[in-house]
């Protein structure tokens, strides 16, 4: 059975993972340990797209901390600044799946 368009849009392709890994030097952007490029800035559950501008390299511990603890706000603020530095014109609203391409 084919995947829904939304589901495909939220997945992180191997090409995106490779680009993000290179962008982040293979290290967790929070603590500097070796990491994997599989963390969504805007979560998949919130329709966050699997695009470079929404993906971060994090180690396992920091990924869990970002997803499941009260540190999320502090981490999110840092990640937002980090992504803005990497992508001039970075816009959080462009990171969310929008079936109808309607401006929010």
Enumerate the language-model features and the residues they cover.
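A boundary/linker detector
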Residues: 1-23, 31-35, 72-104
């Amino acid at each position: 059975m084919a995947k829904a368009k939304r589901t495909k849009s939220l997945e992180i392709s191997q090409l995106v993972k490779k680009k993000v890994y290179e962008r982040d030097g293979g290290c967790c952007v929070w603590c500097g340990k070796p990491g994997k490029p599989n963390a969504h800035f805007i979560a998949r559950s919130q329709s966050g797209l699997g695009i470079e501008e929404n993906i971060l390299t994090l180690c396992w511990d920091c990924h869990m901390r970002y997803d499941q603890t009260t540190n999320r706000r502090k981490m999110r603020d840092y990640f937002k600044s980090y992504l803005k530095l990497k992508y001039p014109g970075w816009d959080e609203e462009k990171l969310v799946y929008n079936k109808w391409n309607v401006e929010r």
